[in-house]
Regions:
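Short beta-strand/loop motif that positions the catalytic acidic residue
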Residues: 249-251, 255
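C-terminal catalytic histidine-bearing segment of alpha/beta-hydrolase fold enzymes
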Residues: 264-319
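Conserved alpha/beta-hydrolase "acid-adjacent" motif
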Residues: 256-262
């Protein structure tokens, strides 16, 4: 936990320093991709403590030799839907970018992920959830951990799942094959929405008649799950139970931001609750590598996910 707090800037700090800014503008999805408002205009949702207008800031720091983009100060969350390519399997994945609940690594851990999964016949949706301070986070102003008064990120995640299911016919989705995939803070969000059957907001329209829990969950290099001392209990999460969906966890042992015990403690809780779970740990790989392939074996994780989705019956049997 101490290491997580001290090195959180590996992902979030770059977005907060002028030296890292190449250009800034409001983020838009790739051409041809539909971006929809997550909430009706009349919905009374909490507003994060923003520093200004929403902006997408290209970072000078490189991942696999390429820059990445951080979205800051999101007040109006959206869902960008990438249609399945080829034979539609009916599977849908909602992607939660990481960024310490302060910014969103929108391409590295968002749009690029959808580009990788849609060729498998999977509909993919990137959630641009509210930040900053929408989940438990490290606040530089007080040099302390803070929890939001309203679980804004969790509310956005639940709403995104309900919204996808409500429009399943339109997007060719099987409402019983809707999963989540999150990185870092987004990994915590994947775990949180997987263990919270109760809606954390007042329903706003007919879409909220749908279930809020996903049918499967992918948790990559998560944070905020371990108290730094005990492996017997998960922190910042509703109780893990047999109702938690099948889960895939992946992390590197040399992760400098979130200790590998973040994954281990969650794995042990799932194991105890008899939830089908796969845990993949690698000696090397670091943090925030997204879906960008390098010489590190861990970056070839998408092939493991594809095999796992076949194994749990989400994707049809492999030929």
């Amino acid at each position: 936990m101490i290491r997580t707090l001290a090195l959180l800037g590996v992902v979030t700090g770059a977005a907060m320093t002028d030296a890292s800014i190449v250009h800034a503008a409001q983020w838009q999805p790739p051409s041809g991709i539909e971006q929809i408002a997550l909430w009706p205009d009349a919905a009374a949702i909490a507003r994060p403590e923003v520093r200004g207008e929403e902006r997408a800031v290209e970072q000078a720091s490189l991942v696999a030799g390429q820059p990445w983009t951080a979205v800051e100060d999101v007040v109006r969350p959206t869902l960008s839907v990438f249609p399945a390519k080829g034979a539609n399997t009916g599977v849908a994945i909602v992607v939660f970018p990481g960024g310490g609940y302060n910014v969103l690594a929108i391409d590295l851990e968002g749009t690029e992920v959808c580009d990788g999964f849609t060729p498998l016949g999977i509909t993919c949706a990137v959630l641009k959830y509210r930040v900053p301070g929408s989940g438990e986070h490290w606040d530089k102003r007080c040099n302390c951990r803070r929890k939001p008064r309203e679980p804004m990120a969790l509310q956005d995640a639940q709403r995104a799942i309900s919204l996808l299911r409500s429009r399943a016919g339109e997007w060719g989705i099987d409402p019983h094959k809707v999963g989540v995939l999150g990185f870092s803070a987004g990994g915590h969000l994947s775990a949180a929405v997987s263990n919270g059957p109760t809606r954390r907001y007042v329903p706003v329209d007919g879409a909220d008649a749908q279930r809020v829990r996903p049918d499967f969950s992918l948790v990559l290099y998560p944070g905020h799950l371990w108290d730094g001392r005990h492996l017997e209990q998960v922190t910042n999460l509703a109780p893990v139970s047999a109702a938690t969906p099948p889960t895939f966890i992946l992390q590197a042992q040399d992760d400098p931001v979130d200790d590998v015990h973040e994954s281990i403690v969650y794995y042990l809780a799932l194991l105890k609750a008899q939830v089908p779970v796969e845990l993949h740990l690698y000696a090397h790989g670091g943090h925030a590598f997204g879906m960008r392939a390098t010489a590190q074996p861990i970056t070839h994780w998408p092939a493991l996910v594809e095999t796992w989705l076949h194994a749990i019956g989400m994707l049809p049997p492999a030929r």
